[in-house]
Amino acid sequence: MSCTRETGGAAPTRGQKILAATLRGSLSVLLKPAFLSRSPVALQRHWLAALSRTTLPARGVPRRRTVLGPVPVELTGNGHSGTVLYLHGGGYVSGAPVTHRALTSHLAKLADASVAVADYRLAPEHPFPAALDDAHRAYLALLEKGHAPERLAVAGDSAGGGLTLALLQRLRDEGQPLPACALMFSPWVDLTLAETPPTVPGEAMLNRQWLMFAAEAYAGNQRDSAGASPLLGNLDGLPPLLIQTGSDEILANDSERLAEALDGADCDARYQRYPGRWHVFQLHAGMLHDADLALAECRDFLHRHWR
């Protein structure tokens, strides 16, 4: 099989151009300085949570706290089409269900789905493979609760995108029932940073120094293991994948390399690149038209594969 490559997004209106420039500038000024290796992890977590309040969760989407096995989750939406296990980003050292409510609530509403956002353990307090173990336990708990795998999906952004891929590989290797499909937004799939550029024009959030810090905090000397860097693992026999990334982000190369690797794998995959968009721009759903279009693509992908 091969990985189908597509260009996402639509020609922006003048208003959308102004909005995009404003959002990009806000990220560069307010968020990027917090993602410095010398910033205390507690500050990074607090700052990310505070800035997430500037996003717009979908209206009328219920949420409640519950658990899947031993893993706390925030259950978003109560749709009946299927269930998504969502693994948030944050470099394995920050992020939480609250920081990703805009993305997860709009996804739940669009797809008529329930989205279970795992509040997995973070590094450096809980290094590799704690996050992967929690994702694994949460997925198995969904199966134990009677969720049919053909009505399940796994999704994640950034570190959570890499975690999504690593979880699929572990489930496949164990012979566990695989979900119907998976979504990955700007996935971080190679923690060795062997081919990560120093920077890219227009990068609004991340920098290589912080990625090095986060990779070391999470995986230490195991950064080249498939569980931490799933790009280096076996990609055969995985469920259908949808990968979305922006052109203006330092991790775009991870998605490009993943698409190339999937060309030679026994896996059906689609890779959508959104020109002029930044890292996990889908977090601006409800404001940015391209974010809404991207999540509509996710809805269609889920409905195509859920049975």
Language-model segments: which ranges?
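A glycine/proline-hinged amphipathic helix-loop "lid/cap" segment
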Residues: 1-76, 307
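Alpha/beta-hydrolase superfamily serine-hydrolase fold, recognizing
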Residues: 26, 65, 69-74, 78-307
